[in-house]
């Protein structure tokens, strides 16, 4: 008979047990977190105050920045606290909350990226109908679905996490409460959780990625039909930022969640998780601003008005 324990908290093993590395990581991730907050909040404010950015593309981008703020804030503050603390713990309730928001925000982000791909197709493939087809009402509907679906999916996934049983050590080999190390640590109730995690991740990633791939196939066809070299260059420039963000985000998530949790995969996943929980939210504003002339112009106007 299994010796189940009434878990009240978990120990987060984090990235390293060496004190000198912990201090270094604290400084690095604090700087990354500050840049993430400034970049994403700055992007939201810029889109809000700039009339030239008042179109569907930047409407979706503002929501992507909003999700990245919460995505990073769900993990980073607790990680920073534990890097300097001798007691590297998280309560059971705190762990479930972290799991809930993490899964919800991942699903919201992948479907926002899909909506952005569809928006780019409408702008490039049907420019004359773009204004009527991508109206404010349509954009609100497209952005509402990811939030509702993401949070409902996360609620179900978190309830399955709640059904896990733990015995013996309650050490999570990670720097936040992630599903793979929790499943690896559990001693019962893992079957449903493990396979629903893989199936749900597979279905949602496949569906959203299919929308993106189909949208880009139509975009490519539309670009090849363009007679103007300048038009082609502008279209490629517009899509390049989004495509870069898609490849980085999906690549890391697929590596993390579409494999059965093993000791090796959990250890590898921990390194990958650093990238998509801290680095990607920091990079997104840079990706979308450095390669976007409209954002640069809007930024210069705001700076010139404030000087």
Swiss-Prot record:
Glycosylation site list: 3
UniProt entry keywords in alphabetical sequence: Cell membrane, Disulfide bond, G-protein coupled receptor, Glycoprotein, Membrane, Olfaction, Receptor, Sensory transduction, Transducer, Transmembrane, Transmembrane helix
Compartment(s) of residence: Cell membrane
Molecular function, one GO term: olfactory receptor activity
Record-level GO cellular component terms: plasma membrane
Coiled coil: none
Disulphide bridges, residue numbers: 95-187
CDD domains, per the entry: 7tmA_OR5M-like
Family designation: Belongs to the G-protein coupled receptor 1 family.
Task performed by this protein: Odorant receptor.
Protein name (database record): Olfactory receptor 5M3
Lineage: Eukaryota, Metazoa, Chordata, Craniata, Vertebrata
Gene name of this polypeptide: OR5M3
